[in-house]
């Protein structure tokens, strides 16, 4: 009786151990991350010392360190909802020495995105980044899918990603130091974020439509009184220009082309949280009498992309407040810039991005199955084990959105090479035609601002 009972206990223990012993799929690079003494990573504020090495397997990437000579680094948690709402945690890596990682340019700072909130085959962030890169925002974070082993335990599928920060190979503007008081230096090196989380140095104001807006500071973080006065005045001036009546004033403070590119990425991805949180803007230093303009970007979080699946603009009855963009979209100069970027994307990139998304999803298939084995049954678990179905679902949503935008904009407006010819200017700097209809003339064709052809010389 006792022998049989012991055998049963052993079998149960072995089965339980087998359930937990999920191994990497071997189809992606493996990141081995180990904390000193095996201590857990329990918060986002305090770094834990440790080591990292990367085995690329047969993926074509270069190795980084080895099991016997790993690289020293500082490790901590990161994220907001993705940190608090899921057992599968995202992480930040800060190498002691700058490293080139999986073909991405040298830097100390990297993040491991868990994508535990993505139920569309882990494709939201990767494809959002692909579109941003294709459209040509000045800098787009790069990422590589990997499998993570933390303190000897397999954690599943992650995305090793460039950390958004000011610096060479990232947002390449001149850095501004904390507590700076120099009048010239404080005009640039800013990166801020329209945020939905309160921080101590937040700038808060009421948008002209009554919505309360919080802007957090990425760089610099600790402000002198001179810096704070400058940045508060800049945010106020930007808000006033967006809600003002002068196109010239808007174009003087905001880079319209970059704003149009950023918006188009969000509209294609149908991201209804895109101007609510993780919406970044940056500004370089003024120089030689030239005032540098604020630029939207870089893109970051597409965690709610394609959630709504609605035939309306991302700022039209949004799930979350979409700050500034609803008003910005009323400006003809902005509409025109968006139509130009849409023309380029529609003719040059839409099909290539679709295929890139399919190929990327196929790379994740086996790792996604292993990830589901690890995290099934945990908090807010999203099951991405059936990548073929989820890939098809994502592509259908992408195609649907492209088709809906085509119904609104047509093929867009061909970009001008030497400015725009129009017939007259109204009292607020908007371009008008005889009866008040907005037009644009290019390449022998006359378009409405919606992209419809009025007449052609051909």
Regions of interest found by a model, annotated:
Residues 28-29, 39-41, 48, 71, ...:
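Middle-to-C-terminal accessory/interaction subdomains
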Residues 94-100, 107-109, 114-116, 136-141, ...:
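Internal "kinase-insert"/substrate-recognition segments embedded within catalytic cores
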């Amino acid at each position: 009786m006792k022998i049989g009972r012991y055998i049963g206990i052993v079998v149960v223990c072995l089965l339980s151990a087998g359930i937990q012993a999920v191994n990497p799929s071997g189809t992606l690079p493996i990141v081995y991350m180990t904390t000193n003494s095996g201590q857990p990573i329990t918060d986002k504020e305090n770094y834990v010392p440790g080591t990292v090495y990367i085995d690329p397997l047969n993926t074509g990437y270069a190795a980084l360190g080895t099991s016997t000579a790993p690289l020293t680094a500082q490790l901590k948690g990161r994220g907001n909802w993705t940190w608090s709402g899921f057992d599968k945690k995202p992480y930040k890596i800060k190498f002691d020495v700058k490293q080139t990682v999986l073909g991405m340019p040298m830097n100390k700072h990297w993040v491991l995105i868990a994508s535990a909130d993505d139920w569309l085959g882990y494709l939201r962030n990767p494809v959002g980044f692909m579109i941003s890169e294709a459209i040509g925002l000045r800098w787009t974070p790069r990422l590589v899918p990997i499998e993570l082993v933390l303190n000897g335990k397999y954690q599943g599928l992650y995305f090793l990603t460039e950390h958004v920060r000011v610096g060479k190979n990232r947002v390449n503007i001149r850095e501004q130091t904390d507590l700076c008081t120099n009048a010239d230096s404080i005009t640039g090196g800013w990166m801020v974020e329209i945020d939905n989380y309160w921080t101590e140095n937040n700038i808060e104001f009421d948008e002209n439509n009554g919505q309360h807006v919080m802007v957090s500071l990425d760089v610099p973080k600790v402000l002198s009184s001179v810096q704070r006065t400058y940045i508060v005045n800049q945010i106020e001036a930007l808000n006033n220009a967006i809600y003002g009546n002068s196109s010239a004033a808007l174009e003087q403070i905001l880079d319209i082309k970059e704003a149009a590119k950023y918006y188009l990425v969000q509209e294609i991805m149908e991201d209804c949280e895109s101007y609510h949180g993780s919406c970044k803007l940056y500004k370089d230093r003024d120089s030689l009498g030239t005032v540098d303009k604020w630029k939207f970007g870089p893109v970051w979080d597409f965690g709610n992309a394609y959630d709504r699946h609605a035939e309306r603009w991302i700022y039209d009855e949004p799930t979350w407040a979409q700050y500034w963009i609803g008003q910005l979209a009323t400006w003809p100069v902005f509409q025109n810039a968006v139509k130009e970027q849409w023309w380029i994307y529609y003719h040059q990139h839409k099909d290539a991005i679709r295929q890139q998304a399919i190929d990327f999803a196929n790379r994740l298939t086996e790792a996604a199955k292993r990830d589901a084995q690890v995290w099934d049954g945990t908090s807010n678990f999203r099951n991405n084990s059936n990548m073929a179905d989820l890939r098809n679902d994502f592509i259908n949503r992408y195609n649907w959105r492209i088709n809906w935008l085509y119904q609104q904009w047509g093929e867009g407006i061909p970009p001008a090479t030497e400015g725009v010819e129009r017939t007259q200017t109204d009292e607020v700097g908007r371009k008008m035609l005889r009866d008040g209809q907005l037009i644009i003339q290019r390449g022998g064709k006359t378009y409405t601002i919606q992209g419809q052809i009025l007449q052609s010389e051909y």
